[in-house]
Amino acid sequence: MGDAESTKDRLLLPVERVENVTWSDLRDGSFTVELKRLIFFAAPMAAVVIAQFMLQIVSMMMVGHLGNLSLASASLASSFCNVTGFSFIIGLSCALDTLSGQAYGAKLYRKLGVQTYTAMFCLALVCLPLSLIWFNMEKLLLILGQDPSIAHEAGKYATWLIPGLFAYAVLQPLTRYFQNQSLITPLLITSYVVFCIHVPLCWFLVYNSGLGNLGGALAISLSNWLYAIFLGSFMYYSSACSETRAPLSMEIFDGIGEFFKYALPSAAMICLEWWSYELIILLSGLLPNPQLETSVLSVCLQTISTMYSIPLAIAAAASTRISNELGAGNSRAAHIVVYAAMSLAVIDALIVSMSLLIGRNLFGHIFSSDKETIDYVAKMAPLVSISLMLDALQGVLSGIARGCGWQHIGAYINLGAFYLWGIPIAASLAFWIHLKGVGLWIGIQAGAVLQTLLLALVTGCTNWESQADKARNRMALAYGT
């Protein structure tokens, strides 16, 4: 009891008062040290994100060789499942970016393990209604006016993805468990081992098991479970996790309220942005020549989704470092992380966007051999390059927000920026001004501009001493429970 009281007292000690960090304060070498730390975190994390992203891509590629019906149904099912399930699980699990990151910074190591189990339990509960939606996908797609044959095959594909959804509910908290301790090597090794298993497994299930396109869905489900089992084994057996491991106990139920307090706005923040881009693809189907418009916008979305792995990795690094430093009461260090992370974001934005702009005439050939599609994609390339710049900036700013626990602010910003500003502009330009797909993309990027500006304003006006105080008080309260 005495140890518990002393720990709580330590957490309640006032944070050292320092003035806000300026560029002149960064000449002491702390900025360079933090920049290197973020790079060593973000580089392997980007590889992890790409390896995870490639699981669906590999399944889609193999299913695509079975015919147009198989490809169309798998694409529709994957899009539906991403929107109604996987995006929601990812969003909910981002609560741990705040809770576990700050707990680790405050040296409440055991709390990290307990929070991970709490998240698994909560996400498993959420998967129950989501799986019912997936199980009835065929009926829902028919109500939405989809082709009956495509809806039937998509419904079967989604049903075989349901086991993978529950695996995802285990996998995402485990990923955050390692990420918040800056243990990226287990994530890197595991992701590539699973990817190397997934490729032959998917090939066998699609072409040699008699399952056909359903084999692609089963391969994703099995690979997700393998990923979760490998990470869980590392957590259980590795000495690197000895301080943060916690036994299963009734204590996991004590943190359910705290988890959902951050999980629900986290999910809203992630899903509102994710769904806005999916809505743009749906709107493109209402334009004249919908096949061309939808194909081109899908190529643009696929491009920015792939390139987003880099800012997503930087955001993960920034979120972890900021939450750790705030939990430790180091407000100045957290502020320096912001400078370093945004510097990396600007560098990424310039390199990636300029590369696409220079190679815009080759851009379309990667995705299509149709001349009309290639020319249209080349026309869209300057707009996509702007999108890549905005994604780099807002992605890292969103990571900073998660590290500080501003998910509710981020949710309001995304709601206003995309649904009250960007999408109305997109619809107006596309259908009233007749700019078609270009108008849709300009509109959604208008939303991204407003989102980036508002997130930057919130970050720039932050009192970092106050944020450190809030984090320490939150940890003291949690420790007291």
UniProtKB/Swiss-Prot annotation:
First-listed, main subcellular location of the protein, grouped into a coarse class: membrane
Keyword Membrane: yes
InterPro entries noted in UniProt: MATE_euk (IPR045069), MATE_fam (IPR002528)
One GO cellular component term noted in the UniProt record for this chain: membrane
Species of provenance: Arabidopsis thaliana (Mouse-ear cress)
Entry's transmembrane regions: 38-58, 76-96, 117-137, 154-174, 187-207, 214-234, 267-287, 296-316, 336-356, 380-400, 415-435, 438-458
Gene Ontology MF term list: antiporter activity; xenobiotic transmembrane transporter activity
Cited Pfam families: MatE (PF01554)
Statement: the UniProt record of this protein carries the keyword DNA repair: no
Protein location: Membrane
Domain of life (superkingdom): Eukaryota
Topology relative to the membrane: Multi-pass membrane protein
GO biological process, one term: xenobiotic detoxification by transmembrane export across the plasma membrane
Protein's recorded name: Protein DETOXIFICATION 12
Keyword annotations from UniProtKB, A to Z: Membrane, Transmembrane, Transmembrane helix, Transport
Family: Belongs to the multi antimicrobial extrusion (MATE) (TC 2.A.66.1) family.
CDD domains recorded: MATE_eukaryotic
